[in-house]
């Protein structure tokens, strides 16, 4: 991917600032690694809370870094409790907005005075951490915003202000959240066709005009227009029309994904930089050995991501629905995946499925999805999971939880034709039916064929040296980070 820099004096210095949740940290780490390969000195800024979690999950030396790839931390402003701070997104968003600017500014002031690192020359910040813009402007350096959502999800967020102006949000009270309301056709977001209000990110469905997430999204979407450029973890063939529509209302937008494919092409897994990880949970790799014993396309992979919370009743419906399929399955079940209590599976279920299932608390998902034994994915439709599934050619059963997962579900099922949605009020009979359809049915067969085609296009986008995402990454490095472009 182009030339490398050599001496420390020449090195540009990028500061990478992810939003402090797992689904944001992982893709930012990939961007940071790719920039390091390009010759950048990297400072990666976690919150103190996540910095300490990474040390616990990956070992005491996990964040020692390299001379040219260093880790720093700033407080998130939340009180120290036994509760996982990354799970309460409204509290986390409110706190980072109010409390992170001053510590971040002090951190950069300290870095600037150091003689053993190059001067800070650019910032890559999560789009939801826009307080960093104030510091970038003060330093006079370019800042790229990395929105870790799909382009369709991001496009919806950009138009949240119009929902308020049109009186669609907030609603008077919960009784207004009717089927008729949710089926309201939204035909005024550019390049998003056949979309209903129920397909828009969940933060829009509120009764509170002071709703933290509603106002947070509106604010961050507005402030992102001050960035030098915007990058998205998607690829042009997948979301071309939406990305083109963004170009007229935002700074230059560059799709540079799927990032995991780009990283796999550029960085050796067992190299020093390749071994750097960002998982807040300890990965259990035994599942890969288990998958090695299974037939091609025979296993259902089940993972609802790092934030999804369900009730005990929902957990049981999924469990018994999966049991009824007779299929082999690998289920990632976080201990905190059930609201207010530890996830507990009935002994009867464990006994009935003993010879055809594996349960784990966290896993190396990219390796799991690319394993030939995996034939389907029961997912919450988080964007990292959706994109990884698409680029591995694996069709999905979609159970969106919150944020833009509803939008990802809509596009996965109707536009990209790789998903089947399951109702929010999950029932074991429906779980059994859709999983059987996914794995054995005619619709499932067509979805798998479509997923394989998306895999081909994802690989094409990240193929060296001329894939569209490869070229876009070169452009953001050379035109934006190494030579500030005008904010258009």
UniProtKB/Swiss-Prot annotation:
Its EC number is 2.4.1.-. This is UDP-glycosyltransferase 85A3. The keyword Transcription regulation does not apply. Keywords: Glycosyltransferase, Transferase. Belongs to the UDP-glycosyltransferase family. UDP-alpha-D-glucose binds at residues 306, 363-365, 380-388, 402-405. Expressed in roots and flowers. It comes from Arabidopsis thaliana (Mouse-ear cress). CDD domains: GT1_Gtf-like. PANTHER family: GLUCOSYL/GLUCURONOSYL TRANSFERASES (PTHR11926), UDP-GLYCOSYLTRANSFERASE 85A1-RELATED (PTHR11926:SF774). Pfam families: UDPGT. The gene is UGT85A3. One of its GO terms (molecular function) is UDP-glucosyltransferase activity.
């Amino acid at each position: 991917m182009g030339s490398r820099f050599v001496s420390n004096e020449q090195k540009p210095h990028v500061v990478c600032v992810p939003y402090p949740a797992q689904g944001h940290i992982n893709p930012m780490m990939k961007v940071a690694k790719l920039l390091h390969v390009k010759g950048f000195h990297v400072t990666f800024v976690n919150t103190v809370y996540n910095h300490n979690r990474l040390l616990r999950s990956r070992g005491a030396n996990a964040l020692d870094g390299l001379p040219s790839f260093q880790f720093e931390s700033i407080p998130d402003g939340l009180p120290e409790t036994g509760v996982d701070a990354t799970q309460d997104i409204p509290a986390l968003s409110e706190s980072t907005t109010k409390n992170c600017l001053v510590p971040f500014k002090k951190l950069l002031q300290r870095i600037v005075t150091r003689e053993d690192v190059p001067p800070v020359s650019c910032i890559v910040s999560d789009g939801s951490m826009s307080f960093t813009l104030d510091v970038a402007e003060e330093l006079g350096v370019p800042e790229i915003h990395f929105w870790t959502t799909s382009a369709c999800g991001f496009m919806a967020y950009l138009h949240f202000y119009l929902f308020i102006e049109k009186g669609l949000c907030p609603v008077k009270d919960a009784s207004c959240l009717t089927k008729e309301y949710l089926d309201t056709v939204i035909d005024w977001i550019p390049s998003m066709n056949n979309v209903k209000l129920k397909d828009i990110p969940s933060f829009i469905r509120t009764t509170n005009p002071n709703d933290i997430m509603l106002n947070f999204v509106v604010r961050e979407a507005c402030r992102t227009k001050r960035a030098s450029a915007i990058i998205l973890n998607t690829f042009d063939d997948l979301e071309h029309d939406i990305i083109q529509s963004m170009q007229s209302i935002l700074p230059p937008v560059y799709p540079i994904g799927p990032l995991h494919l780009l990283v796999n092409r550029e960085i050796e897994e067992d190299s020093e930089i390749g071994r750097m990880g960002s998982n807040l949970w300890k990965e259990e790799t035994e599942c890969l050995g288990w998958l090695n014993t299974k037939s091609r396309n025979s296993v259902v992979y089940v993972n609802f991501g790092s934030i999804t919370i369900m009730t005990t009743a929902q957990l049981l419906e999924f469990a018994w629905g999966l049991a009824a399929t007779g299929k082999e399955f690998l289920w990632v079940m976080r201990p905190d995946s059930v609201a207010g209590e530890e996830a507990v599976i009935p002994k009867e279920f464990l006994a009935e499925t003993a010879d055809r299932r594996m349960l784990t608390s966290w896993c190396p998902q990219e390796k799991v999805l690319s394993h030939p034994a995996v034939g389907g994915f029961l997912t919450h439709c988080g964007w990292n999971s959706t994109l990884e599934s698409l680029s591995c050619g694996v069709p999905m059963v979609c159970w969106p939880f919150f944020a833009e997962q509803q939008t990802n579900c809509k596009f996965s099922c109707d536009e990209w034709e790789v998903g089947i949605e399951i109702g929010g009020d999950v029932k074991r009979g429906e779980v059994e039916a859709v999983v059987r359809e996914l794995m054995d049915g005619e619709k499932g067969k067509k979805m798998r064929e479509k997923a394989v085609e998306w895999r081909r296009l994802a690989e094409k986008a990240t193929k060296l040296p001329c894939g569209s995402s490869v070229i876009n990454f070169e452009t953001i490095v050379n035109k934006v980070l190494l030579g500030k472009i005008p904010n258009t």
